[in-house]
């Protein structure tokens, strides 16, 4: 089996024109087209919206219990006390992005229990 790192290096050094030519030749050799793979994804666009993987947790407002919200923001992120306080006081702000659905819902529930108004996007 060829050295995969060498193949990766070789592919990384290709220009855009060379990469397009490589793609074209591979399509011919393997008897496939790049468009065929993209068509099912486009048709399932509505379903992809519902099955969203990454969520952004937005703090809309801190509510009356700002200290509790700051504590939960610190627990959900790696922010220090001052950064978490600034985030909470500057609402609406993004608390965390790229979070899976389960974790996003857990963080949202904790922030809401602390008194915050939160949205998932």
Swiss-Prot record:
Entry annotated with the keyword Kinase: no
UniProt xrefs under InterPro entries: Ribosomal_bL12, Ribosomal_bL12_C, Ribosomal_bL12_C/ClpS-like, Ribosomal_bL12_oligo, Ribosomal_bL12_oligo_N_sf
A GO molecular-function annotation: mRNA binding
Superkingdom of the source species: Bacteria
Annotated keywords: Ribonucleoprotein, Ribosomal protein
GO biological process, one term: translation
GO cellular component: cytosolic large ribosomal subunit
Gene3D superfamilies per record: 3.30.1390.10, Single helix bin
HAMAP family linked: Ribosomal_bL12
Family recorded in the similarity comment: Belongs to the bacterial ribosomal protein bL12 family.
Stated role: Forms part of the ribosomal stalk which helps the ribosome interact with GTP-bound translation factors. Is thus essential for accurate translation.
Assembly behavior: Homodimer. Part of the ribosomal stalk of the 50S ribosomal subunit. Forms a multimeric L10(L12)X complex, where L10 forms an elongated spine to which 2 to 4 L12 dimers bind in a sequential fashion. Binds GTP-bound translation factors.
Protein name: Large ribosomal subunit protein bL12
Organism: Pelagibacter ubique (strain HTCC1062)
Gene (name only): rplL
């Amino acid at each position: 089996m060829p050295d995969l790192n060498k193949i990766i290096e070789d592919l990384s050094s290709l220009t855009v024109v060379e990469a397009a030519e490589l793609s074209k030749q591979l399509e011919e050799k393997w008897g496939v087209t790049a468009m065929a793979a993209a068509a099912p994804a486009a048709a399932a666009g509505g379903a992809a919206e519902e099955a969203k993987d990454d969520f952004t947790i937005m703090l809309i407002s801190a509510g009356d219990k700002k200290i509790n919200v700051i504590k939960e923001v610190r627990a959900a992120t790696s922010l220090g006390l001052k950064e978490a306080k600034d985030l909470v006081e500057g609402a609406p702000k993004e608390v965390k992005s790229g979070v899976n659905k389960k974790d996003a819902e857990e963080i949202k529930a904790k922030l809401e229990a602390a008194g915050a108004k939160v949205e998932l996007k």
